[in-house]
Amino acid sequence: EEMKSFNNEYFKQLTFVKHILNYPWSSAGEDMFFSNLKQNDIKALDYIKNVEDKLENSSYGHDEAKKSLLQIIGKWISNPNSQGTSFGLVGPPGVGKTLLAKSVSEALDIPFAQITLGGQNDGEILHGHGYTYSGSQPGMIIKKMAEMGKSRCILYFDELDKACSKHGQVNEITSILIHLTDPNMNNSFQDRFFQGVDFPLDKVIMMFSYNDSSLVDSILLDRIKEINVSPYTISDKIEIIKNFTLPELKKSIGFDEIDIKITKNIIEYIIENYTMEAGVRNIKRKIEEILLTLNLDKICKKGLFAKNRKSIVLTEKIIKDILKLPISDITDIHLKPEIGIINGLYATTGGSGGIIPIQVFINASSATGE
């Protein structure tokens, strides 16, 4: 009997059927690909080399992470039926954790889906609502798997350390993720919407990103291979700006016909005077602001483009004219020794730090009367 679209249950049952049909139940085809590589050493070597090249070209640095991912590929080739794994990318904001995860997807030519956990406090976002509830939906895990349509894929959970506990109770999200990362249990993941249906997730690469591992549940952390994504050095940032950010922004803005020259010294000047970060987000915004300003001048034929120039060499004066005063204010502190005061160093999980004065003084004690 056909159910009409005006029936209250129509769209709920349609959602149920669509997700069941679109879910990647079998990995036979994907396993066969790696089985063929196992039988041919030359093809296997070419495949690994191709993946390695793609990783190098798509993101700068992160050698430890790339090495770990190549090891997983090696395992898939040696044992095509092998399971996925769980990675934790820990590091300050802006150091390229999400970019790295996406570049892995592109290098392996497998689907990628992102689930943001920041601010979430209910497990329903991951394992859905009970089917009998009005307006119930599957959780994000099954939704994303059905969208990707392949059992070998990447599920990327962003901001793991910012997932909230619910009213002081056991954190539902953490409990679900502990089950998800257990290799003995994740071949039978259950979503509340599908009441008793076991979904295999054992071929999936689970990737988690977080800034502070001390905020992550210890049981969950024990099941994750943690990879430290370190803050960029100034030389790292310079290479990223010259080889990745500048070409990307020029293409995005449509500035390809203009030759923009920026020296390492100028990039370093912008970094040290207009940004305070471990990553490259703010420096990218500053470079973008410079290019957008120059692009508008080019269109209006004013400023540096009053004479229809085809080449621009960025200087400190141009930077100051566009970005105005630097945000960094370098001051000398404690020019002479002072009794009871020393300088200490501080560091934040955001990758920044500095000098902080530490002072020792004595308070009168009410207990002794002194």
What are these regions (language model features)?
Residues 1-78:
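Extended, charged alpha-helical coiled-coil/arm scaffolds that mediate oligomerization and mechanical coupling
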Residues 81-87, 151-153, 204:
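Pre-Walker A (Motif I) flank of P-loop NTPase domains
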Residues 281, 285-370:
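C-terminal engagement/docking regions of AAA+ P-loop ATPases
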Residues 148-152, 189-209, 258-262, 314:
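AAA+/SF3 P-loop NTPase mechanochemical coupling elements
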Residues 157-199, 222:
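Conserved catalytic/switch belt of AAA+ P-loop NTPases
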Residues 149, 212-222, 226-285, 296-308:
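Conserved C-terminal "switch" segment of AAA+ ATPases
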Residues 107-137, 144, 236:
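AAA+/P-loop NTPase substrate/partner-engagement loops
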Residues 82-117, 146-147, 178:
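Walker A/P-loop
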